[in-house]
Regions:
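Glycine-rich phosphate-binding loops of nucleotide-dependent enzymes
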Residues: 2-247
């Protein structure tokens, strides 16, 4: 079952077409990858999905609801979470405090709608997420004191405090060493077992090929291939456009 569908999405910036009639589906409970060269349109597509960029044409649906013209905060209420390529954290706050802020924000709009999603307290939820992301021992450190690899986990933890059904991850392995990337992949696989769908943009092919159930490839704003990791790795057009430079 598709949790997210993108139908014929086109985005233009002046005379430049950033996305050209893009269509794809992200299956529920799976890890889907989006790869392609720099400037292919990957982040632009994530911005369209999350409501930060208006599409000139096309439609986006999430959990069966059309969200094409919805504000970003409304998409979050429909179960969409996101992390960014550039870290969006509070460096002067601790890891635990950064995560707590996200939970408090979620509780504010949930209480207004009389929709609590869960009867867990914020403290219980934070403890659970710290354990899941391996951040328990770093909880009292200020974000400015931890390495980038761990800061990426804090971004993920903050998103999880929103109780998302689908999380968009924009280059989550950036700044991580090989061990951190492997551990991050294991966390993503745990999340799918809990029913959370993952859609990630990533240049680290070791992460993409080890965790993704399905991969889409963008080049010059158009989808040039999609399939399993094995199919993508053996696709000549993909190799010529992108993977060849990674080998």
């Amino acid at each position: 079952m598709s949790q997210l569908t993108i139908n014929n999405v086109t985005v233009r910036f002046g005379g430049h077409t950033a996305l050209n009639n893009v269509s794809m589906a992200v299956e529920s409970g799976k890890i889907t990858g989006l790869i392609g060269p720099n400037g292919a349109g990957k982040t632009t597509l994530f911005n369209v999905i999350s409501g930060l960029q208006r599409a000139d044409e096309g439609e986006v649906t999430l959990n069966g609801k059309t969200i094409t013209n919805k504000a970003p905060y409304k998409r979050a209420r429909y179960g969409l979470g996101r992390t960014f390529q550039r870290l969006e954290l509070f460096p002067s706050l601790t890891v635990e405090e950064n995560i707590r802020v996200s939970g408090e924000i979620r509780n504010q709009w949930a209480s207004k709608e009389r929709n609590t999603h869960t009867d867990k307290s914020i403290d219980e939820k934070i403890k659970e997420i710290l354990t899941l992301t391996g951040l328990t021992d770093s909880a009292d450190y200020h974000v400015a004191e931890i390495p980038t690899g761990k800061a990426r986990l804090v971004e993920l933890a903050r998103s999880l405090m929103q109780d998302p059904k689908l999380i968009l991850l924009d280059e989550p392995a950036s700044g991580q060493n090989d061990l951190e990337t492997a551990e991050f992949g294991q966390i993503l696989q745990k999340l799918t077992k809990e029913g959370i769908t993952i859609f990630l943009v990533e240049h680290d092919m070791s992460l993409v090929m080890s965790v993704c159930d399905h991969v889409h490839v963008l080049d010059f704003g158009s989808i040039i291939a999609d399939g399993s990791t094995d199919e993508i790795q053996s696709n000549k057009r993909v190799i010529d456009a992108y993977l060849g430079s990674e080998q």
